[in-house]
Amino acid sequence: MMSKLGVLLTICLLLFPLTAVQLDGDQPADLPALRTQDIATDHSPWFDPVKRCCSRYCYICIPCCPN
């Protein structure tokens, strides 16, 4: 039984190698709205142009200023 399972696993790995799976490691996933330009932080009323960050309401305006 174990040898049949090993053969099946080997065949599956040869037909569909793990390197063919697309990984999300090289894609930025933390700011998808900024990537698609859905949020214009420069025009936000909470954006501080001197500090180049948002003073409050960080769930609306990105990036947040450190407290």
Swiss-Prot record:
Keywords, in A-Z order: Cleavage on pair of basic residues, Disulfide bond, Hydroxylation, Neurotoxin, Secreted, Signal, Toxin
Compartments, record wording: Secreted
GO cellular component terms, semicolon-separated: extracellular region
Domain of life: Eukaryota
GO molecular function, one term: ion channel inhibitor activity
Signal peptide: 1-20
The family this protein is said to belong to: Belongs to the conotoxin M superfamily.
Record protein name field: Conotoxin TsMMSK-011
